[in-house]
A protein has these predicted regions:
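Aromatic-acidic/polar surface patches that form glycan- and anion
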Residues: 42, 137, 182, 186
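N-proximal short alpha-helices
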Residues: 18-23, 158-162, 166
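Hydrophobic ligand-binding cavity/cleft-lining segments
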Residues: 3-84, 91-98, 103
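A short acidic/glycine-rich loop-to-helix N-cap element
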Residues: 132-133, 163-185
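Glycine-rich portal/gate segments that line the openings of hydrophobic small-molecule binding cavities
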Residues: 11-12, 41, 70-153, 157, ...
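Long, contiguous hydrophobic alpha-helical segments, chiefly transmembrane helices and signal peptides
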Residues: 1, 53, 88, 160-164
Length: 202
């Protein structure tokens, strides 16, 4: 069962408003940093789970209605090299995240910085290849990590964390929405890693 460190969200209609409203730019101050952590239990040992965290095959088509609104969602991940300095690419529906590895403690801790990220969502428009200014620079992912903990009966507690900066005002209001959306992205990846690992372990 996956867990998330946040309260439940308001009804569907309030969530939909996020995509109908324009983002509000904060005053020119230093963006505030936040972290979101999600956890899932995997019925496989860390040595197997690790391999599916570092890189993973293409995820199944999205079923979550939220991603069908245009929100960027993960598709696959690949890595060039091993150890600190290797470059991981996490492909999203709007483009790749470029993630240089900063911590490589196999099979328990993988951390990476983010040097490039795609747009957070695909704008609803009749025109292709449009990059609206109101999507640029308001939300930046700065780093991420996976922690794998061996627990009872050969299982693994898998924890994913994303650090991000929010340049929207009011920051703590938008944090609620941002955390919710990041958690949904986490769960898409964590559930896929769980599925792959448990199939390999059986």
């Amino acid at each position: 069962q996956a867990t998330y460190h946040a309260n439940r969200m308001p009804p569907l209609i309030l969530i939909a408003l996020l995509f109908l409203m324009g983002f509000e730019k904060a005053k020119p101050t230093k963006p505030i940093s936040f972290a979101v952590t999600s956890t899932i239990e995997v019925n496989a040992p860390p040595e197997i789970v690790w391999q599916n965290v570092v890189s993973f095959s293409e995820l199944p088509p999205v079923e979550d209605w939220l991603f069908k609104t245009g929100l960027a969602y993960p598709i696959r991940a690949k890595i060039n090299g091993t150890g600190v300095g290797a470059i991981r690419h996490c492909e999203f529906s709007t483009g790749p995240f470029v993630e240089p590895i900063t911590v490589w403690n196999e099979p328990s801790h993988l951390r990476f910085s983010v040097t490039s990220m795609p747009q957070p969502m695909q704008e609803w428009t009749f025109y292709k290849h449009i990059e609206p200014a109101h999507l640029d620079g308001y939300f930046q992912t700065t780093q991420g990590e996976f922690r794998l903990e061996s627990i009872h009966d050969g299982k693994t507690r898998l924890q994913g964390t994303t650090w991000y900066q929010n340049d929207l005002a009011p920051a703590h209001y938008w944090k609620v929405w941002s955390d919710f959306l990041i958690h949904r992205i986490h769960l898409r990846v964590l559930k896929h890693v769980k599925h792959l690992s448990e199939n390999q372990s059986n």
